[in-house]
């Protein structure tokens, strides 16, 4: 292929296996704008990964961990100003403001492009531009889509190799004219000739920008996680949700798990929870005592792409894939007791970010073990001891510290996790963290009622005082920070999809709402959670099979005490009543809060939701 020659821009050195002229022209255009010192086309090989990691170790960005403790694993410590997603600097630049809706930040696309062109002009001087091709989902899957990220961060290149199917094989799928989502990322810290780099370059000015109509992502100023690994939330949720709206499918902030009965029948569920509600723990659940022969397997812990198609019997079903190939998990709180499978996944080939370093070259974080080591180097590179922590309250690991680990290493990984066809979804589960009001589990009576439950779900942001409800942050479908278009239109999309499926005679998944976090009068959790959540999962399967009647109440159907399997757990009918009960007064208050959410979204809100609310109110007043 002819190599474009440009003034002051390095040779593109396009590999012969890249046959996509539009892609090459785009790389050339971005290189001309950002002016890197060189362009490197990532091939996704182990050799390339090892070389980039070695270069980052030499630069002080990574520290290699003790191979006897964590084989082929590294620790990165970020700049203290660059530790999390920046929601206030995240923009959806649709042509019309109303298409972004009231829950997203919006700027007119032409104005934003002008801003970005100024910021990106020369932003990669002295650095390498890495061309990172990746498939979200198994290569060639009808549910998968391809992206290419141009980044000046080798940290991004190596993390993308773990988190996605990244490398040369992507170009085989892309061919000469395949579709791809263009993603441009810079840490925003150009280097002058001879200037010494810092271990974690970033810029106080940050922009994470999505152009839904042209399916583009531009990210400036952050090297961290979801701001920089653009396949994750930016593509897999914000851009993909708009693709799903336009093309008739779903991109969801959901785990996917499989449940296999002792008889060998497997069911698949997709579940949405806001942060701090135990999503990864649920995805990797280990069945408790009393469930011999049952098996739970993990397909994904964070994102599901779901498309309708016919099964072998000609029945339309919803099929889901995990578009990712790795876990980008929050480290604190992950330990052998809370998530054995996650800990087993982290034994080798992991990149840790902002956790603490032990004196023998391993990692540690709060919640990993009951007793912390006597001495650590904390996430900011400072000495840390339990005494210092007691005195100052300083954490050894940052609360949002992370691990990037290959999904294939997870002991509970589902044999179908890499199946290009996806798995048929039998049920959707939605849940939040509520100390009162919301029962342990409720099944929606129909699709619209299920969408209503998901649209109004939320989590408490403060610990509720006794007799008071905490402040509830609504997080519809756990998608509030991640929906790439108007949230009210998103509700309408779910309703429309359900309607279309029902009209085609499709088998609709059941919809359940759960809450593991009810508290008693003393403020203690009543439900034991973790592996015991299997008991609720089993009841859902019984409902799918028509084997459990449940009790119908104002808001749907919940289990009777005797319908849950209690073998191996001492949990009384009185305790069960505390987690399943409905308080009419609390629910009147709750419905008032639902009205506030609907008022915020009134402009595009589908009429079916206020109608569902009116039916609930009528039942409540009964």
UniProtKB/Swiss-Prot annotation:
Name of the top EC class for this enzyme: lyase
Binding locations of Mn(2+): 233, 253, 302
Cofactors named for this entry: Mn(2+)
Its annotated pathway? Carbohydrate biosynthesis; gluconeogenesis
GO CC annotations on file:
cytosol
Biological processes annotated in GO: cellular response to glucose stimulus; gluconeogenesis; glycerol biosynthetic process from pyruvate; oxaloacetate metabolic process; propionate catabolic process; response to lipid; response to starvation
A Pfam family found in this protein is PEPCK_N
Subunit comment for this entry?
A: Monomer.
Provide the protein name. Phosphoenolpyruvate carboxykinase [GTP]
Q: What is the originating organism of this protein?
A: Ralstonia nicotianae (strain ATCC BAA-1114 / GMI1000) (Ralstonia solanacearum)
Q: What is the lineage of its organism?
A: Bacteria, Pseudomonadati, Pseudomonadota, Betaproteobacteria, Burkholderiales
Gene giving rise to this polypeptide: pckG
